[in-house]
């Protein structure tokens, strides 16, 4: 019999919140990897996460070629409100309080201007802005909420995007954590 570990007692309830698990990125591909929406690929290439859109993609980037807030990989939301990064997190308890924390930044790809992410969990929503100079960098943000079900849907959606040299760019999301508050 194997021992079960309760994620609410040991740390992060989000699966692959650091985005370290995902498709292989070849070292000679400085543009990252475009990940298709779940409608095109029932089994998401980003374990734990669904890419929700009719036709748009997200960009999976690496620290070798981009600014990544933590670790070696992150996700850049390049299609604005037309795509969302979603995870159904099991194990939440209705009526209990939780904190969702994450990093938002830019990929050091020349994307200049105001970048924004709308984040949703349970009945709460928060828009987080990041003023990008296009040279890399990030800031940490959080959303506190009270669970309304045994499973909580966590959603990240870019509130805007930009174009640099005919290439879409947007906010980078990384280091996603969900913990129960005492």
Language model: regions and residue ranges:
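Aromatic (Trp/Tyr/Phe) and Gly/Pro-enriched flexible surface segments
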Residues: 1-121, 125, 129-182
């Amino acid at each position: 019999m194997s021992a079960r570990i309760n994620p609410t007692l040991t740390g992060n309830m989000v699966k692959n919140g650091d985005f370290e698990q995902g498709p292989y990125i070849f070292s000679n591909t400085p543009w990252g990897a475009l990940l298709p929406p779940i409608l095109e690929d029932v089994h998401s290439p980003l374990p734990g996460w669904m890419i929700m859109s009719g036709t748009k993609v997200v960009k999976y980037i690496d620290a070798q070629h981009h600014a990544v807030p933590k670790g070696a990989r992150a996700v850049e939301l390049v299609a604005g409100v037309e795509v969302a990064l979603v995870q159904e997190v099991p194990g939440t308890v209705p009526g209990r309080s939780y904190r969702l924390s994450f990093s938002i930044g830019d990929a050091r790809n020349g994307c200049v201007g105001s970048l924004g992410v709308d984040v949703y969990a349970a009945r709460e929503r928060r828009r987080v802005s990041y003023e990008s100079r296009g040279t890399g960098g990030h800031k940490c943000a959080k959303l506190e909420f009270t669970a309304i079900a045994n499973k909580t849907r966590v959603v990240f959606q870019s509130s805007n995007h930009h174009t640099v040299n005919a290439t879409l760019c947007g906010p980078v999301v990384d280091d996603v954590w969900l913990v129960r508050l005492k």
